[in-house]
Amino acid sequence: MLQKREKVLLLRTFQGRTLRIVREHYLRPCVPCHSPLCPQPAACSHDGKLLSNDVTHYVIPDWKVVQDYLEILEFPELKGIIFMQTACQAVQHQRGRRQYNKLRNLLKDARHDCILFANEFQQCCYLPRERGESMEKWQTRSIYNAAVWYYHHCQDRMPIVMVTEDEEAIQQYGSETEGVFVISFKNYLDNFWPDLKAAHELCDSILQSRRERENESQESHGKEYPEHLPLEVLEAGIKSGRYIQGILNVNKHRAQIEAFVRLQGASSKDSDLVSDILIHGMKARNRSIHGDVVVVELLPKNEWKGRTVALCENDCDDKASGESPSEPMPTGRVVGILQKNWRDYVVTFPSKEEVQSQGKNAQKILVTPWDYRIPKIRISTQQAETLQDFRVVVRIDSWESTSVYPNGHFVRVLGRIGDLEGEIATILVENSISVIPFSEAQMCEMPVNTPENPWKVSPEEEQKRKDLRKSHLVFSIDPKGCEDVDDTLSVRTLNNGNLELGVHIADVTHFVAPNSYIDIEARTRATTYYLADRRYDMLPSVLSADLCSLLGGVDRYAVSIMWELDKASYEIKKVWYGRTIIRSAYKLFYEAAQELLDGNLSVVDDIPEFKDLDEKSRQAKLEELVWAIGKLTDIARHVRAKRDGCGALELEGVEVRVQLDDKKNIHDLIPKQPLEVHETVAECMILANHWVAKKIWESFPHQALLRQHPPPHQEFFSELRECAKAKGFFIDTRSNKTLADSLDNANGPHDPIVNRLLRSMATQAMSNALYFSTGSCAEEEFHHYGLALDKYTHFTSPIRRYSDIVVHRLLMAAISKDKKMEIKGNLFSNKDLEELCRHINNRNRAAQHSQKQSTELFQCMYFKDKDPATEERCISDGVIYSIRANGVLVFIPRFGIKGAAYLKNKDGLVISCGPDSCSEWKPGSLQRFQNKITSTTTDGESVTFHLFDHVTVRISIQVSRCHSDTTRLEIISNKPYKIPNTELIHQSSPLLKSELVKEVTKSVEEAQLAQEVKVNIIQEEYQEYCQTKGRSLYTLLEEIRDLALLDVSNNYGI
């Protein structure tokens, strides 16, 4: 029987008054204990995971241990952990949402042997707070009382160890109850886990950092920064309009000087501000870090400053360029932080000379983060000299107003600086990507498909699904070497003369049950991560490359959409959604499908499915396939024309296809040539996504997962408009339709690169496409700007996107709802779905950033060992696409590289080009105009560089010990580069790009073979981050994007 209590909360209002609120608090005789030793499992109603059977004790951390040592409690070796509700709520209220979410994710993770016990709702565990008792003492007392009850509840069969940092609690409770031990966390590790070296090192690091903070707080220091305002003052100021809330974004090129705050939830329509707010200098930043949600106070207009328009090195100071800034813009200072964005940071220790220069205080070291946007971090360690050549991970603990730098602690070593695996590990950590192998529990949920036990269609599924194996010609069109085929197509003529178009997608949700171990893991990963030389799958290969891959000639489960189209106008008459069984007849490559579409039938010899057919059957099947591809293309043209009429955009994205040999080694990297069949497949997928979006929204208007692409801010198009104007083009950005038409008309007859660059600039002006729950915003905000569709979602790639898995479940639920059948499984509420969407959006950004950074890593490693003065491959043609105060930005089509080329060097000399067009540095000055920049020397020579001029560029690498290496561009001639032997750029680029990846990998392998004894740290790192063993690095690689500055297509498209 429930018992009712009254819980008193004291809240402070915006006006500063204390408000007393009384809430009802109900206590239950039984709450889930999640223990296999439970004597009353039915009464406890266990739901979810249970604690492991193979433990010697249960450990219960108190609230302070959970707050300070959560990263150690995350170690998978530590099992049988019981987190009390009291401790979890303390984390939520005192450490903020980020750490609380980290704790929640730990509790959800099936790989970790830990559970949540709701002690404050259990009748025997709940203790009211006594008069005069501090919150901290009550929390410790409540947790101990719950630990005693839990021990007796398990019939005294499992010892309980409560770990706490409260010495009084250890003295008071240490020997009070037999079977319940109360000790410090340090003693717990010493006695129970003496061999867990990593945990001991991390614990020592945390303790040392805490002691340093306590010592600093006791010492008298002058304040380096103003104190942050109290939360109630910040909230009141935001509500009144005095303060502005937003996310801090630091300029990586001027990290010490410039940061910007973009308003949250504000637009030009409801705010006087039409631009970001500039935060100038570290003092005004007031201890906020890139990504923090901050509160800003605007400065008076006479104190506003302009953003820097000059090119600068990442480590330059405020006066490095000596150039005037742009027009003054809204400028402010940070007065408070609402949410910290602290995470794991990869750092490098200072050189030996720098360590020695710090003198007697050498145990406190300033380490430099790999990310330029993060300030140096002070940590306490005695390993500085030992770890000088390694990249290590640290965490920030605090940043007091009396300290110039934040304080942190050492976590672990990643790998040697410059080592390929160490650099890849750095990219993963910096993007918060965890790629540990799938666990045994997850793999046990997977179906079996072996020669001894082959997988077969079950009779039950045959009864429930529509069987298309004999009635439909189903085929796939994919890149060469593709293993995870998650979409196939079909088209046929119906008896009434109309056409039937079908899109058939792998039925992943048949194999991945909601809230199963593999479902939770896929939800955590959210996407497959593609790096330049490998990929980390969202699902195990038995699904992604086998049973969920719609391979040719085998039976597979699918979810299908089939439209009946008018035979002449292709108008959609009706649509059918449902589960099917298919057998794909052909697994075509894009190139082969295009050849068939163009009438070149000789390509049929390269299609395996035709090889064993007699001439008559071969001819008949070939005619059937050619007709199907042609009809699909005709339908796609019609669908695309309809979207074009509504303003669909075609933006610039450069893709490359990786060509593999029979041994799965890389053979070539070929830039993806635009083929009409690409558009055909894409249009069919867009059509399917659009119709599924409409269906799930109609059935679940408040909890459907859709994808929106908001219109961009008009001010972001200013550079695009000005650049187009320089070539005599007018870009109308009032709507997606006018923008699309303008870009189509901005075609220079003599230089197609101009249109590519204009489309790239349009892409950079775009806002990101995001997943959202339909219950969280108004219907008019559902629109997808880039695709010109009122509703859109992702349905067609469930093998590599968790969003598509959610959409498949929603579609199945919608179909059941139409049939008035019971909906199986619990759908996400609007609140939970919105939280999931935020997580998926975050992981998608991480995937894009890691892909871009890994590509840049390979570019740098390729050029690093080449002498730019003598190596022909370091010279290339470049196109100027932006003018700055002291240089230009250049795009190199041959390698897809964008970068800065200086026209004034650090010595103040400017570039000069003589009669032979070769450049040299001389005293002089630069004069910048809107679309050009002129360099004039003191002896009267001058050279002018215009937007979209072709110049000859030398590529070299700027090596950095603490950060990633970067490509450096130097203009060596103001004339276009003449390719030797009159080779065309697009013909030579595949060979060069192949060498880029192939040579880097080869050099790494040679270095590894030459190294007789590997460093243990590298081995540990390899085990943690390498997902596959025993095969080539390229086994999993099917396709990568050749990024310039952005992952273009993912920002706006399918």
From Swiss-Prot:
It comes from Pongo abelii (Sumatran orangutan). It catalyses: Exonucleolytic cleavage in the 3'- to 5'-direction to yield nucleoside 5'-phosphates. Residues 465-816 form the RNB domain. One of its GO terms (biological process) is rRNA catabolic process. Its EC number is 3.1.13.1. The gene is DIS3L. Keywords: Cytoplasm, Exonuclease, Exosome, Hydrolase, Magnesium, Nuclease, Phosphoprotein, RNA-binding. One of its GO terms (molecular function) is 3'-5'-RNA exonuclease activity. Belongs to the RNR ribonuclease family. Residues 365-431 form the CSD2 domain. The lineage of its organism: Eukaryota, Metazoa, Chordata, Craniata, Vertebrata. PANTHER family: DIS3-LIKE EXONUCLEASE 1, RIBONUCLEASE. Residues 236-309 form the CSD1 domain. This is DIS3-like exonuclease 1. It is found in: Cytoplasm. InterPro entries: Dis3_CSD2 (IPR041505), NA-bd_OB-fold (IPR012340), RNase_II/R (IPR001900), RNase_II/R_CS (IPR022966), RNR_Ribonuclease (IPR050180), Rrp44_CSD1 (IPR033771), RRP44_S1 (IPR033770). Component of the RNA exosome complex. The catalytically inactive RNA exosome core (Exo-9) complex is believed to associate with catalytic subunits EXOSC10, and DIS3 or DIS3L in cytoplasmic- and nuclear-specific RNA exosome complex forms. The modification Phosphoserine is found at S989. GO terms for cellular component: cytoplasmic exosome (RNase complex). It comes from the Eukaryota. Its cofactor is Mg(2+). Disulfide bonds: none annotated. Catalytic component of the RNA exosome complex which has 3'->5' exoribonuclease activity and participates in a multitude of cellular RNA processing and degradation events. In the cytoplasm, the RNA exosome complex is involved in general mRNA turnover and specifically degrades inherently unstable mRNAs containing AU-rich elements (AREs) within their 3' untranslated regions, and in RNA surveillance pathways, preventing translation of aberrant mRNAs. It seems to be involved in degradation of histone mRNA.
